[in-house]
């Protein structure tokens, strides 16, 4: 029978860690802080599995380029993110994400997963077969591209005749791929933890600017009516909601005007919400985002029931919205603080458990 994690960690000068990094968009920057805290405390990461943003951070760390990636992420502003957006007229998604992948390729280089110094698994979802797909061989960038294809937002990625999308659809916290790793400690990092405080206020000016820039950037590719069709899609509105605003609408697009900012949802919905004291006002896209978070939290709990982690670190959903990729500095700090707190508590428990075992 394997020794408890407490004894395995206590008996090692550099405890071996298997790490499961969950999906959750920009909250995935917290994974960087978690890994930094582990390294500072002398833990040796010997296996990584990741879904979506967890696949990105896990992949760059397995390639030995986490510090470079963190530096790049911290340099991102709202304007640079706008330049990285890669609009698509495909019905499968409003973004292609190729510019973002180019930036990741520049950091990690042309490396194959089987050549990485740390065993690594990226998890994606086969949309046609309805199954999870594990990438443990092949180009790292292709595995990451498949794992980050948010449904309806980033177009799916075709690999060997399979249409692949975000790993978080079926496996938002991939514990199974690291179950066989020879480690002293298994750590799961979930990005769908309970709220730590009130949700942040919307940033309407940011979203209005995003829409105006999107219209101008896409006008060279297709006509204004096509741009209107693209940005009027529910998935496009969901992107705007996740970017940090309630919603943005325009009455007239014929001359690509500046965007008029309005509250989310039709008037009837707003009146109904206003008539119900004590309930938060949620537009249709906030409802959709919340639905996704609830589903992923339930899937993660189901996974942990079958593959328990020795230590679970939960990043609150309120840390940031899924597409607020300009907030790397503060989200990394949140991850580092949560990991430090969790590891300190675990190490204290380890000391007490070990003492009790010896005395018993």
UniProtKB/Swiss-Prot annotation:
Gene3D superfamilies: Cytosolic phospholipase A2 catalytic domain (3.40.1090.10)
Record organism: Mycobacterium bovis (strain ATCC BAA-935 / AF2122/97)
Domain PNPLA: 19-179
Gene Ontology molecular function: any one: lysophospholipase activity
InterPro entries, A to Z: Acyl_Trfase/lysoPLipase (IPR016035), LysoPLipase_patatin_CS (IPR001423), NTE (IPR050301), PNPLA_dom (IPR002641)
Keyword tags: Hydrolase, Lipid degradation, Lipid metabolism
UniProt-annotated catalytic positions: 52 (nucleophile), 166 (proton acceptor)
Region annotated Disordered, chain positions: 251-282
Chain segments annotated as transmembrane: none
Source domain of life: Bacteria
Name listed for the protein in its UniProt record: Uncharacterized NTE family protein Mb1092c
Motif GXSXG boundaries: 50-54
